[in-house]
A protein has these predicted regions:
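N-terminal regions that are enriched for targeting/export leaders
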Residues: 1-64, 78-81, 90
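Short, conserved catalytic/metal-binding motifs centered on acidic residues
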Residues: 22, 253, 305, 360, ...
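Eukaryotic short linear interaction motifs
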Residues: 31, 257-259, 278-281, 298, ...
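Terminal interaction-prone segments of large eukaryotic proteins
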Residues: 43-228, 490-740
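Core catalytic machinery and nucleic-acid-binding channels of phosphodiester-processing enzymes
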Residues: 206, 211-229, 235-251, 257-273, ...
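Short coil/turn segments at secondary-structure boundaries
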Residues: 261-265, 283-286, 348, 372-376, ...
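Compact, glycine/acidic-enriched structural inserts
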Residues: 272-315
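Domain-level detector for long, ordered catalytic/regulatory cores in large eukaryotic signaling
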Residues: 314-547
Length: 740
């Protein structure tokens, strides 16, 4: 373990040459390190003992990829004593109040389909499942449809069970099929009120209910009747074990694999556990690497990830849960996909916003041509109003329609339609499946290759593999589950545009005055060491997100004597809006969303009134949809990407120490080494070398992390969590609102 730590991980990776140099120097001091080969062998063995696995695959167009097993990563997380105790496995019904974590979001609470919700609760030694009849303490039989937390206790949303006695002495069980979480026909009951599960309920004459209902439950709506088989399929899969519901936040981005300015593009995929409170999940320690490639596109790289997620969300997997000290069945599902605007456009099969006549991935904002963008109708639509200036609800895109449009384009090509007709179809629907278009190009350029043969085979057997894999991802709606991300839309978008516009309009004297005002600005409440005033003014075109955070907070105090009144109004409105957007705690969601919409409209109207050419920047429009993202997921800080962006540096370090023969595999192996070391130092149980017993790290190994701030920092872990209990940490998170 000592040799592995010296060889480094994440940001401190060491080359073989440097390690050998240190080994020789320490040998002079009679300190003997294991050889480099021994260290690498130990890392490989440690991977096997800590559930680490990787999968090699070829993309549909033949690019090799290596993906770290999501199942292995989740086994580590639930077996990790540091992580498991903080995880939420049930959504929390906060009733729109005191929202600060993802487990309180509306999607997790009630917007998953039936088979992807939290499936069961345990009361005593009994397990109760959704869409199964259950008897409660007043002897009535109900059907739970949702399980959730409220006030640190488990609750259920249940509906009435209708029983029809048939002439054959059998019974027909039915429930209403048009019930949602907030329906007046739903009832809230505490978990302790459940008495008997489905298989123990008896009918009036003493016969077991399961023997006379044909194990069927009818869900009836005016339009259809659906037969639900009993018992819940997850009861059979769980085999008496607890089921852990684990939503995931997935992120993808491109970064350079070089330290130099020469661009060496690597597409990477990371994830984090949505059940962790933000104070924990925002630590680098809890960012999980999944895959990277310097040749495959984001959709190619995502294909094996989506495939594994679908398998896991269908069948689950067994692992040890450290918080329960027992084996559990894990049900992982996707909660959201994070990325910048170009990445979101690729994932949602929409056109790149900067050059498109349909620049929004969420709604159907459209201009017929470039000249149409200069019309009043388009400007009104851009800020969410009709031609009379009245606010209107946006015409939202449909994920199903997007998939249909992509397939329609493919079939046009297969029928030999001219290129102009295909391009016209893409423009009409605003849908461009990048993976499918790449496949079309590959077929045209390489008629007789092995890749083309494989594509033709898939067209007959598994045509869905020729399209965006996210179409098939269970529980994912590309247009709803790609929330408006504030780093790229607000800081690196709106604030950057307006600041550059401001600086370009200043004289030399005004710029000097601005520098002086920045220098005299009191930063005692900004939690930053200093303001680089000259840098902010002279290098305004090279600023990064943290610089714009400083600028937007200083703007009300340093800008207003050097700009005209019309710009002052825009900046005042933007400052009000940003002070709302960057709140990490929402006391009342309904009021917050209403205020957010109001401030957004105020800002956009003042902006467009000053210069309507801002409609050429799609990020001003996408701001309109931020309130929808907040209503679905909670405070914007919960889907911020800074923690993932900073992790790009770790990928870069791993790339530098790759042999460059197979970067995807080398980098994946490097992160698996880190994952194994992290898990072992955290005190997770390991599989013995003979694979027949479980071994726990010694207290000396655990103390390397628990009592050593340097090692904690090495792994990206804040030592604060060792000083407080989980409940105290959660309580403190509820009371903090955080500055920008």
């Amino acid at each position: 373990m000592i040799g592995c730590l010296i060889a480094g991980c994440t940001r401190t990776l060491m080359s073989r040459k440097t390690y050998n140099h240190i080994q020789v120097v320490l040998r002079l001091c009679d300190v003997h390190l294991p050889s480099w080969k021994t260290v690498q062998s130990a890392k490989t063995q440690l991977q096997k003992m800590t559930h680490c696995k990787k999968y090699k695959s070829l993309s549909v167009i033949g690019n090799p990829m290596t993906t770290v097993s999501i199942q292995g990563l989740l086994k580590q997380e639930l077996g990790n004593p540091i992580v498991a105790k903080y995880l939420d496995f049930y959504p929390e019904n906060s009733k729109g109040e005191n929202i600060y974590k993802l487990s309180q979001c509306e999607k997790w609470l009630h917007q998953y389909p039936r088979d992807l919700r939290a499936q069961m609760i345990r009361v005593g030694d009994q397990s109760f499942y959704i869409y199964e009849p259950a008897q409660i303490i007043d002897r009535n039989v109900v059907v739970p449809l949702y399980f959730y937390n409220k006030g640190n206790k488990l609750w259920a949303k249940v509906c009435k069970l209708n029983v029809l006695v048939l002439p054959s002495s059998l019974v027909e069980l039915s429930i209403s099929g048009d019930l949602n979480f907030y329906s007046s026909n739903m009832k809230d009951i505490m978990a302790e009120e459940f008495l008997k599960p489905y298989h123990e309920i008896t009918f009036n004459d003493g016969r077991p209910l399961k023997s006379i209902c044909r194990n069927e439950l009818y869900e009836i709506t005016p339009e259809r009747t659906e037969i639900i088989k009993l018992p819940n399929p997850w009861r059979l899969k769980a085999q008496g074990r607890m089921i852990r519901h684990v939503p995931l936040s997935i992120y993808s981005d491109d970064t350079s694999g070089n330290l130099s300015k020469q661009w060496n593009k690597h597409i990477s995929i990371f994830m984090s556990l949505a059940g962790l409170p933000p104070h924990i999940s925002n630590q680098e320690y809890n960012t999980l690497f999944v895959a990277t490639s310097n040749i495959a596109t984001a959709l190619e790289l995502a294909a094996p990830v989506v495939e594994e997620l679908n398998i896991l969300s269908t069948s689950g997997f067994f692992t040890f849960d450290h918080s329960l000290q027992e084996d559990v069945l894990v049900l992982p599902v996707i909660l959201m996909f994070l990325g910048d605007s170009p990445m979101h456009a690729e994932i949602t099969s929409t056109l790149h916003p900067n050059v498109s006549l349909q620049p929004c991935r969420i709604c159907k904002l459209k201009a017929k041509n470039k000249k149409d963008k200069a019309t009043g109708t388009y400007v009104d639509n851009f800020i969410g109003r009709n031609t009379n200036g009245i606010l209107v609800k946006p015409n939202l895109r449909s994920w199903i329609d997007t998939k249909k449009a992509a397939y329609h384009t493919w079939y046009l090509v297969q029928r030999g339609a001219p290129k102009t007709q295909v391009q016209s179809c893409i423009s009409e629907f605003g849908v461009k499946d990048v993976l499918n278009q790449t496949i079309i190009h590959t077929i045209k350029e390489n008629q007789d290759t092995k890749v083309t043969y494989n594509i033709r085979r898939l067209q007959d057997d598994s045509i869905e593999k020729l399209f965006n894999p996210f179409y098939e991802l269970k529980g994912f709606d590309g247009h709803k589950d790609t929330p408006v991300e504030v780093l790229h839309v607000i800081l690196l978008g709106i604030v950057k545009y307006l600041y550059r516009d401001l600086i370009c309009g200043l004289t030399v004297d005004k710029k000097e005055e601005l520098v002086a005002r920045f220098q005299s600005f009191d930063i005692s409440n900004l939690n930053i060491p200093s303001i680089k005033a000259k840098y902010l003014v002279q290098h305004y075109s090279s600023l990064v997100g943290k610089d714009f955070k400083i600028i937007i907070q200083a703007a009300p105090f340093v800008f207003f004597t050097i700009i005209e009144e019309s710009r002052q109004k825009i900046w005042i409105s933007l400052c009000h809006l940003c002070s709302l957007i960057f709140q990490t705690h929402i006391s009342c969601l309904e009021n917050y969303v209403a205020n957010l919409n109001s401030f957004t409209q105020d800002f956009l109207i003042k902006l467009i009134s000053s210069n309507a050419q801002w409609v050429n920047k799609p990020k001003f429009h996408i701001l309109l949809h931020l309130s929808q993202s907040v209503a679905r997921f909670g405070p914007a800080s919960l889907f911020a990407t800074e923690k993932f962006e900073s992790y790009n540096g770790v990928v870069r370090q791993a790339s530098i120490h790759s042999n460059r023969q197979s970067p995807s595999q080398d980098i994946a192996n490097s992160f698996m080494n880190f994952s194994a070391i992290r898990y072992c130092l955290s005190g997770g149980n390991c599989i013995s070398e003979t694979n027949v017993s479980i071994v726990s790290p010694s207290y000396q190994v655990k103390n390397l992390l628990l009592k050593n701030p340097t090692i904690q920092n090495l792994l990206g872990l804040d030592s604060y969590i060792f000083k407080v209990k989980p409940r105290e940490l959660k309580a403190s998170a509820q009371t903090q609102t955080g500055s920008i």
